[in-house]
Amino acid sequence: MQTQPRHLSKPHRQTAKFTACALGVAALVAAGAAHSAEVEVLHYWTSGGEAKSAQVLKQMLEEKGDTWKDFAVAGGGGGNAMTALKTRVIAGNPPAAAQIKGPAIQEWGDEGVLLSIDDVAKSEGWDKLIPPQISSIMKYKGQYVAAPVNVHRVNWLWINADALKKVNAQAPATWDEFFKTADALQKAGITPVAIGGQSWQQAETFETVALGVGGAAFYKKAFVQLDQATLKGPTMVKALETFKKIKAYTDKGQTGRDWNMATGMVISGKAAMQFMGDWAKGEFSVANKVPGKDYLCVPGPGSQNAYTFNVDSFAFFKVKSPDVEKGQKDLASLLLSPKFQEIFNLNKGSIPVRQGMDLSKFDACAHRSAADFTSSQAKGTLVPSWAHDMVVTPAVEGAFYDVLGNYWNDDNETAQEAADKLAVAAKTQ
């Protein structure tokens, strides 16, 4: 899951702005690179469920005769990883593959450093296997330069089942139900909502709130089209008011808390609910918790008919070694293989990005995710997660983070003031 260098713990962030001089030096250094057959993979899957998934990928690649070199960079948001990647590319020593997402793939493509894996994609029919809303993100100038590994749903609400039973409540489907349940939980001495005080977690929570309050059409106009009137309009103000209201139901120890620590609060029963993408399910699985029994996975209030997607992907970098290039293409092929798609996504909490997969081994949360993905695709309510690098530029996303983080932490700022700031942030270059 991941953020930019100044937002240090988000499920992803990347910038790719280099000078021509630096790239020239990089090319010269790369020309003398060692002829190692090892495939170095930069990723930020370092928490329980995610780390297990990385191990699966390593094992499968090595079964193909390639050597995996692990380049794991802690910091769930990927900001630290992208800083490390930028340094390596400038030095002319990029990893063979790196976990990169959304518009950032295009930015790296513009720098001329990405390797086309179109031959693998064509021979394996990726255009028929990957939904078009996702395959378009993986291509640069019509050629695949990245491979997707999964589909995460972001607009989930995770609930401790016992906590709900203690207050005789059902999973909330509306915001009125949500706050009524939160009041009951608070009176029972249970923290209603677990969150980490990091800007990406605040932004992700707001993203789900905005989708639930305004619907998919509003969401697209505001966060895909960046329409100024919508960003500072009454629906946005209502979404911001709802978002701020949630804060009263969180604990005072949230500063700096990582997302998986917040998930742990729900798992243990210290807290009742968490807004988080379905990478959180990996944490429940590692703790041997069962969906429907120990915990519930439901769409955020009001967002039942929409689906916010977040796709993990690996982009491939140009290298001078034919051996490494073979390993890169082996890795690309592996990422879309049915075997890896099944094992990986069972560990990760996500669903396969490869269409037509047998989901019989997947749990109830995954089945709901897959069904809702398909129905949202048909209804036009499938939307990219702006909070997770899938649609806006890193600059705009970072500016949104700042606005929402400041609003969350400033009790005196009004929702209209925050909405006006979002409209300005959308113009960030």
What is the meaning of each model-derived region?
Residues A182-L185, Q225-T255:
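Glycine-centered hinge/linker elements that transmit conformational signals in sensory
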Residues A34-V113, S123-W126, A171, T255, ...:
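Conserved N-terminal structural module of periplasmic/extracytoplasmic solute-binding proteins
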Residues D118-I130, S136, Q170, G197, ...:
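Short, solvent-exposed loop/beta-turn-alpha elements that line the ligand-binding surface or hinge
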